Amino acid sequence: MMIHINNHSIFAFSDTHGRHRDLRVPEKTDILICAGDAVEDNLLGDEYDDFIEWFSSFPAKWKLFVPGNHELSFELGQSEKIEKAMSEKGIQVLQNAVYDCDGVIIGSIDADSSIADENIPTDLDILVTHYPPYGILDDDMGSTEILNFVMKSQPSLHLFGHIHSAKGQKYQFGKTLCINIV
């Protein structure tokens, strides 16, 4: 999905489950974001290698990756290897972190993260998570931690995936436009 904010073009997607090469990424993209589930339960195999090679091939100035629930390697203690492989290809992994893309402040928190309030500033332009906030386009599978963070910080945009049935749907929640980017 193409989004424009602060004179930057952002292409954001999630939940390709190994079918990333089917996406048509616009050439004029400043910020490229994947909100997880790029692979289908693969542990540091060819599927990761192919995704990293594909994702890094775009001329976007910033490439950001937020792990999803299908990135089992992150959950099983392999995140350092993947982050290193991505970093070497110019991809920034955002996991309970913030990144400044030339004045566009983008942050990410985990669905069950209680450290969000401690580490993530509330003046974000964009929040990117894999899971939706509880009660918003979530099929009752959203995160209360994410909901609480969105209520507190009210970023301009909240981009998330995970819920395939809500693909492309938008919901205005206070000052925050929530968009399912599956």
Question: What role is predicted for each listed range?
Answer:
Residues 1-4, 95-103, 169-173:
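Short acidic-hydrophobic surface loop/beta-edge motif
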Residues 7, 13-101:
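Core catalytic region of metal-dependent phosphoesterases/phosphodiesterases
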Residues 7-17, 103-112, 126-130, 177-182:
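Active-site-proximal beta-strand elements of phosphoester/diester hydrolases
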Residues 11, 33, 64, 94, ...:
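Hydrophobic/aromatic beta-strand patches that form the interior of the parallel beta-sheet core
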Residues 15-19, 69-70, 130, 156-166:
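Histidine-centered divalent metal-coordination motifs
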Residues 25-27, 55-60, 84-87, 120-122, ...:
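Short, conserved loop/helix-junction motifs that constitute active-site signature segments
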Residues 61-64, 134-182:
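Conserved beta-sheet core of the metallophosphoesterase superfamily
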Residues 89, 102-149:
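Binuclear metal-dependent hydrolase catalytic cores centered on His/Asp/Glu-rich metal-binding motifs
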